[in-house]
Amino acid sequence: GKYLGTATAVITRDPENNRVNVGTYRQMIKSKDEIGLYTSPGKDAGLDRDKWWAMGKPMPVALCYGIDPLLFVVAATSFAKNESEYDYYGGIGGEPLETFLGDVTGLPLPARAEIILEGHVYPDATFAEGPFGEFTGYYGRPAGETPYVRVEKVRYRDDPTLTCALMADGKANEAGLFWAMLRAAKVWNDLEKMGVPGLKGAWSVPEAAGWGITVVSIKQMYAGHASQAVNLAAQCMGGAYFGKYVIVVDDDIDPTNVNEVLWAMATRSRPSESIDILRETWSTYLDPSQNPPEIRPWGSKCLINACMEYKHINEFSPRTKISENMYKAVVERWDDYGLDGDAPRLNVFEDADFKGKI
């Protein structure tokens, strides 16, 4: 079917505590005044909907298109269930988002959106929705019954702009880098909030569907530190959804450099001791690897400790490094040597007194 909602902001409210949620959910057009609203299990709009339905009421909802890019950023990020994306928008942007109350839903709506639809999602009102090419690079969820919005009011500007997000595989997924940055920032922030010390960096690999692989770099400070960091990174709100591989590396490894991460995995991890599996974790119907599709909301995660073993860290074999002076000399003459591409980026160099240590 035709999809209107890809790069969008969906506004809902928790009827129990009045928390306003802003999320990004796909919306397939059903008719001239009906549009689908698919939410993966555990996502906030779906939880809000279930609460409204448990009260015997339809859920009020607003669908917003042509939105401020920062609003899309926060809408596509996983925050704690009791936090509103509007608050993060104001914190990042330095001022509150300009809103007005919708007269159909009573929800605070972004005043600068190009198009806004207001309506309700009614219990037991579904239609056959999908499939849709998703962020994994697959038509992940087979067509299935999905709730839809009965649109009661439409607002739009003259000649409005409709924002869209291209879903594809690998580097063709324009949202991959976008989501990778958001996920990494949220994981890093969550770990800091939980008091994990020694954090040096976090990154999610864009080519791994943005969310599939996350790397955390730490300066080990005590026994169990690496295990603590990798386990919390896997299950914090920023990292819990869908991600399959979480890797922790030492502070001399750049988590954004896949080559360095792979080298650390190959030379510092011990497969029999360094790999743990978490089962029954938060996943999604959009994951094509799990079949039959009914089991997809329950996933698993592989945790890899690619740090030097802490109990023997002082005896760990010294790392071979190039001198910084030699590196700079080669970089300066890179083109003279007729070498293709850019010089490799290095950020770890031999200590001046290294020779006296071996």
Predicted features along the sequence, with ranges:
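Charged, compositionally biased interaction regions
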Residues: D68-I358
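Internal mixed beta-strand/loop scaffold within catalytic domains of large alpha/beta enzymes
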Residues: G1-C64
